[in-house]
Amino acid sequence: MWYLILWWYFLWRVQQLNLNLIPTHPDHSAGLGYLEVVHLHFAPLIVASSAIFATAFAENISSGVMKFQALYHLVPTIILIYAVLFICPLYIFSYKLWKTKVRGLNEYMIMAHHYVDAFDRKWLRGENPAGEEQLGTGDIQSLADLNNSVNTINDMRIIPASRKLIISFAVISIIPLLPLLLLKYPLLQIVGTLLNILSGQ
């Protein structure tokens, strides 16, 4: 837990820096995508914590201290706790990322307007004093690159965490808890249900 607190403090200090955030960065986080890679290293901690929870729940259910139905509320609560601990701290960058996205869209839209206007006048309105041929010109590729840059900014996230990371954390937090199903449902019934789901029945 101490290392986690240190990491939160590190994130807080980083967001106070004058960061050079690039809205067209391919990580869709203006260059902060490396933070997601760091957070992936918390996966073993999540698995271990879930295993501890699973052991405690199994003992309480087996001894009659807790009913199985209590898991219907406890499991979502555990996932929510993990989200607060490992995902929510990244929201500290949301304001800066949002400002970077808005600034990038504004700047690139202005540049795109000028470029498209010049492209239209040159190739569609005949204002081509150099007599350049369309075949082999780099203008069309530049127009496509500009379009890709604008799309990249539109897809930019306001937190340096992808949907893949969030889903991965949810899955690995649930996996250690799955054996608890055996306390209520026979193994063959569970396997049969899974096969029916996979086969679409």
What is the role of each PLM region?
Residues 1-201:
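Intrinsically disordered cytosolic tails
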